[in-house]
Protein backbone atom coordinates (compact mmCIF):
# COMPACT_ATOMS: atom_id res chain seq x y z
CA UNK A 1 0.00 0.00 0.00
CA UNK A 2 3.00 2.31 0.39
CA UNK A 3 2.87 3.07 -3.31
CA UNK A 4 -0.55 4.65 -2.74
CA UNK A 5 0.55 6.99 0.06
CA UNK A 6 1.38 10.50 -1.11
CA UNK A 7 2.89 13.57 0.54
CA UNK A 8 3.11 17.24 -0.27
CA UNK A 9 6.39 18.38 -1.83
CA UNK A 10 8.04 21.76 -2.03
CA UNK A 11 7.13 23.80 -5.07
CA UNK A 12 9.69 23.56 -7.86
CA UNK A 13 8.89 27.05 -9.06
CA UNK A 14 9.22 30.44 -7.41
CA UNK A 15 5.48 30.87 -6.84
CA UNK A 16 4.84 34.34 -5.51
CA UNK A 17 8.33 35.44 -6.55
CA UNK A 18 8.53 39.22 -6.66
CA UNK A 19 11.55 40.30 -8.75
CA UNK A 20 11.47 43.83 -7.33
CA UNK A 21 11.59 42.55 -3.75
CA UNK A 22 14.27 40.05 -4.73
CA UNK A 23 16.32 42.80 -6.32
CA UNK A 24 16.06 45.03 -3.24
CA UNK A 25 17.11 42.15 -0.99
CA UNK A 26 20.06 41.48 -3.29
CA UNK A 27 21.15 45.12 -3.23
CA UNK A 28 20.99 45.33 0.56
CA UNK A 29 23.04 42.17 1.01
CA UNK A 30 25.66 43.15 -1.58
CA UNK A 31 25.83 46.92 -1.14
CA UNK A 32 29.35 46.89 0.28
CA UNK A 33 30.89 44.32 -2.03
CA UNK A 34 29.37 45.02 -5.45
CA UNK A 35 31.23 47.19 -7.96
CA UNK A 36 31.48 47.74 -11.71
CA UNK A 37 34.61 45.62 -12.04
CA UNK A 38 32.87 42.59 -10.55
CA UNK A 39 29.79 43.14 -12.71
CA UNK A 40 31.95 43.35 -15.83
CA UNK A 41 33.62 40.05 -14.95
CA UNK A 42 30.25 38.41 -14.28
CA UNK A 43 28.76 39.37 -17.64
CA UNK A 44 31.86 38.33 -19.56
CA UNK A 45 31.90 34.96 -17.82
CA UNK A 46 28.22 34.15 -17.17
CA UNK A 47 28.08 31.59 -19.98
CA UNK A 48 31.24 29.91 -18.68
CA UNK A 49 29.77 29.86 -15.17
CA UNK A 50 26.63 28.12 -16.44
CA UNK A 51 28.71 25.54 -18.28
CA UNK A 52 30.84 24.87 -15.21
CA UNK A 53 27.78 24.53 -12.96
CA UNK A 54 26.18 22.08 -15.39
CA UNK A 55 29.00 19.66 -14.55
CA UNK A 56 28.73 20.01 -10.77
CA UNK A 57 26.04 18.05 -8.86
CA UNK A 58 26.12 20.26 -5.76
CA UNK A 59 22.81 22.05 -5.17
CA UNK A 60 24.59 25.28 -4.23
CA UNK A 61 27.82 26.85 -5.43
CA UNK A 62 29.89 29.92 -4.64
CA UNK A 63 31.35 31.29 -7.88
CA UNK A 64 33.76 34.19 -7.60
CA UNK A 65 33.80 37.04 -10.08
CA UNK A 66 36.95 39.03 -9.48
CA UNK A 67 36.88 39.81 -5.76
CA UNK A 68 33.11 39.32 -5.47
CA UNK A 69 31.85 35.92 -4.37
CA UNK A 70 28.18 35.00 -4.31
CA UNK A 71 26.14 31.92 -3.43
CA UNK A 72 23.90 30.62 -6.19
CA UNK A 73 21.43 27.79 -6.56
CA UNK A 74 22.84 25.40 -9.14
CA UNK A 75 19.89 24.61 -11.40
CA UNK A 76 22.16 23.94 -14.39
CA UNK A 77 23.18 20.42 -13.40
CA UNK A 78 20.59 18.09 -15.01
CA UNK A 79 19.70 16.43 -11.72
CA UNK A 80 19.08 19.79 -10.03
CA UNK A 81 16.67 21.36 -12.48
CA UNK A 82 13.57 20.60 -10.43
CA UNK A 83 15.00 21.70 -7.10
CA UNK A 84 13.00 24.44 -5.34
CA UNK A 85 14.24 28.01 -5.58
CA UNK A 86 13.37 30.42 -2.77
CA UNK A 87 12.24 33.99 -3.35
CA UNK A 88 15.57 35.43 -2.23
CA UNK A 89 17.73 32.68 -3.67
CA UNK A 90 20.07 33.60 -6.49
CA UNK A 91 20.59 31.80 -9.78
CA UNK A 92 22.86 32.86 -12.64
CA UNK A 93 19.74 34.00 -14.52
CA UNK A 94 18.47 36.11 -11.63
CA UNK A 95 21.93 37.54 -11.07
CA UNK A 96 22.06 38.57 -14.71
CA UNK A 97 18.78 40.47 -14.41
CA UNK A 98 19.64 42.00 -11.04
CA UNK A 99 23.07 43.17 -12.17
CA UNK A 100 21.70 44.65 -15.40
CA UNK A 101 19.18 46.63 -13.35
CA UNK A 102 21.91 47.63 -10.88
CA UNK A 103 24.00 49.00 -13.75
CA UNK A 104 21.00 50.91 -15.11
CA UNK A 105 20.29 52.34 -11.66
CA UNK A 106 23.91 53.44 -11.33
CA UNK A 107 23.69 55.06 -14.75
CA UNK A 108 20.40 56.88 -14.19
CA UNK A 109 21.13 58.00 -10.63
CA UNK A 110 24.29 59.83 -11.65
CA UNK A 111 24.28 62.94 -13.84
CA UNK A 112 28.07 63.02 -14.11
CA UNK A 113 29.00 62.28 -17.73
CA UNK A 114 32.39 60.96 -16.63
CA UNK A 115 30.58 58.34 -14.54
CA UNK A 116 28.40 57.47 -17.53
CA UNK A 117 31.52 57.05 -19.64
CA UNK A 118 33.08 54.83 -16.97
CA UNK A 119 30.01 52.58 -17.00
CA UNK A 120 29.88 52.46 -20.80
CA UNK A 121 33.55 51.51 -21.10
CA UNK A 122 33.48 49.01 -18.25
CA UNK A 123 30.27 47.06 -18.85
CA UNK A 124 30.22 45.00 -22.04
CA UNK A 125 27.16 43.11 -23.22
CA UNK A 126 28.46 40.33 -25.49
CA UNK A 127 24.96 39.49 -26.72
CA UNK A 128 24.18 43.06 -27.75
CA UNK A 129 27.61 43.56 -29.30
CA UNK A 130 27.28 40.36 -31.33
CA UNK A 131 24.10 41.82 -32.82
CA UNK A 132 25.78 45.09 -33.71
CA UNK A 133 24.14 47.01 -30.85
CA UNK A 134 26.18 49.25 -28.54
CA UNK A 135 25.72 51.69 -25.68
CA UNK A 136 24.95 54.42 -28.21
CA UNK A 137 21.52 52.81 -28.67
CA UNK A 138 20.68 53.82 -25.10
CA UNK A 139 21.30 52.13 -21.75
CA UNK A 140 17.88 50.50 -21.50
CA UNK A 141 18.16 48.88 -24.92
CA UNK A 142 21.79 47.83 -24.53
CA UNK A 143 21.27 46.26 -21.11
CA UNK A 144 18.00 44.60 -22.17
CA UNK A 145 19.95 42.07 -24.22
CA UNK A 146 21.08 40.51 -20.94
CA UNK A 147 19.09 37.45 -19.77
CA UNK A 148 16.96 38.16 -16.72
CA UNK A 149 16.00 41.70 -17.66
CA UNK A 150 12.55 40.41 -18.62
CA UNK A 151 11.85 40.37 -14.87
CA UNK A 152 11.79 44.19 -15.03
CA UNK A 153 9.70 45.07 -18.07
CA UNK A 154 8.72 48.48 -16.69
CA UNK A 155 12.28 49.46 -15.75
CA UNK A 156 13.57 48.42 -19.16
CA UNK A 157 10.63 49.90 -21.11
CA UNK A 158 9.50 46.57 -22.58
CA UNK A 159 12.78 46.19 -24.50
CA UNK A 160 13.56 42.70 -23.14
CA UNK A 161 10.25 41.59 -24.69
CA UNK A 162 10.41 43.55 -27.93
CA UNK A 163 14.01 42.54 -28.61
CA UNK A 164 12.76 38.97 -28.37
CA UNK A 165 9.78 39.69 -30.62
CA UNK A 166 12.06 41.22 -33.26
CA UNK A 167 14.47 38.28 -33.12
CA UNK A 168 11.59 35.83 -33.55
CA UNK A 169 10.19 37.81 -36.50
CA UNK A 170 13.61 37.76 -38.14
CA UNK A 171 14.04 34.02 -37.58
CA UNK A 172 16.87 34.61 -35.10
CA UNK A 173 15.13 32.99 -32.14
CA UNK A 174 12.54 30.29 -31.42
CA UNK A 175 9.17 31.70 -30.23
CA UNK A 176 9.27 29.47 -27.14
CA UNK A 177 11.92 31.77 -25.66
CA UNK A 178 9.31 34.53 -25.39
CA UNK A 179 7.37 32.55 -22.79
CA UNK A 180 9.36 33.84 -19.84
CA UNK A 181 8.87 37.49 -20.78
CA UNK A 182 5.18 36.97 -21.50
CA UNK A 183 4.62 35.71 -17.95
CA UNK A 184 6.14 38.74 -16.23
CA UNK A 185 4.49 41.70 -14.57
CA UNK A 186 4.83 45.25 -15.81
CA UNK A 187 5.01 47.19 -12.59
CA UNK A 188 1.90 46.09 -10.72
CA UNK A 189 0.12 44.88 -13.86
CA UNK A 190 -0.14 41.15 -14.44
CA UNK A 191 0.63 39.84 -17.92
CA UNK A 192 -3.02 39.61 -18.96
CA UNK A 193 -3.49 43.25 -17.96
CA UNK A 194 -0.46 44.80 -19.67
CA UNK A 195 -1.06 42.78 -22.83
CA UNK A 196 -4.32 44.68 -23.26
CA UNK A 197 -3.46 48.01 -21.62
CA UNK A 198 0.08 48.63 -22.86
CA UNK A 199 -0.22 47.83 -26.56
CA UNK A 200 0.84 51.35 -27.62
CA UNK A 201 3.89 51.32 -25.33
CA UNK A 202 4.91 47.90 -26.63
CA UNK A 203 4.48 49.05 -30.24
CA UNK A 204 6.72 52.06 -29.57
CA UNK A 205 9.30 49.85 -27.88
CA UNK A 206 9.26 47.45 -30.83
CA UNK A 207 9.66 50.33 -33.29
CA UNK A 208 12.76 51.49 -31.40
CA UNK A 209 14.18 47.98 -31.59
CA UNK A 210 13.43 47.59 -35.29
CA UNK A 211 15.29 50.82 -36.03
CA UNK A 212 18.52 49.56 -34.45
CA UNK A 213 21.51 48.89 -36.69
CA UNK A 214 21.11 45.15 -36.41
CA UNK A 215 23.90 43.05 -37.80
CA UNK A 216 24.17 39.34 -37.11
CA UNK A 217 27.66 38.83 -35.81
CA UNK A 218 28.25 42.53 -36.42
CA UNK A 219 30.28 45.01 -34.45
CA UNK A 220 29.11 48.20 -32.78
CA UNK A 221 30.76 51.54 -33.51
CA UNK A 222 32.49 51.30 -30.12
CA UNK A 223 33.93 47.89 -31.01
CA UNK A 224 35.08 49.15 -34.42
CA UNK A 225 36.81 52.13 -32.79
CA UNK A 226 38.49 49.77 -30.36
CA UNK A 227 39.80 47.58 -33.18
CA UNK A 228 41.09 50.63 -35.05
CA UNK A 229 43.54 51.19 -32.18
CA UNK A 230 45.15 47.93 -33.25
CA UNK A 231 45.27 48.79 -36.93
CA UNK A 232 42.09 46.94 -37.90
CA UNK A 233 39.64 49.02 -39.94
CA UNK A 234 36.18 47.73 -40.76
CA UNK A 235 33.51 49.21 -43.05
Curated annotation (Swiss-Prot):
One of its GO terms (cellular component) is helical viral capsid. It is found in: Virion. One of its GO terms (biological process) is symbiont-mediated suppression of host gene expression. Keywords: Capsid protein, Eukaryotic host gene expression shutoff by virus, Eukaryotic host translation shutoff by virus, Helical capsid protein, Host gene expression shutoff by virus, Host-virus interaction, Ribonucleoprotein, RNA-binding, Viral nucleoprotein, Virion. GO terms for molecular function: RNA binding. InterPro entries: Bunya_nucleocap, Bunya_nucleocap_C, Bunya_nucleocap_N. RNA binds at residues 17-18, 47, 50, 75-76, 81, 94, 124, 126, 129, 167, 177, 179-180, 183-185. Pfam families: Bunya_nucleocap. Homotetramer. Binds the viral genomic RNA. Interacts with host PABP1. The N-terminus and C-terminus are involved in homooligomerization and play an essential role in viral RNA synthesis. Belongs to the orthobunyavirus nucleocapsid protein family. Encapsidates the genome protecting it from nucleases. The encapsidated genomic RNA is termed the nucleocapsid (NC) and serves as template for transcription and replication. The NC have a helical organization. Seems to participate in the nuclear relocalization of host PABP1, thereby inhibiting host cellular translation. This is Nucleoprotein.
Amino acid sequence: MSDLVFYDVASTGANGFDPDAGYMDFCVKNAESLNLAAVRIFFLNAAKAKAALSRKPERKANPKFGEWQVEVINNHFPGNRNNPIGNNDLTIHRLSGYLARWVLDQYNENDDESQHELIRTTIINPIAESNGVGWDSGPEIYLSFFPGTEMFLETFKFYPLTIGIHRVKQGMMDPQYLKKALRQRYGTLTADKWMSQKVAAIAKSLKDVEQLKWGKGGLSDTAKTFLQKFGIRLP
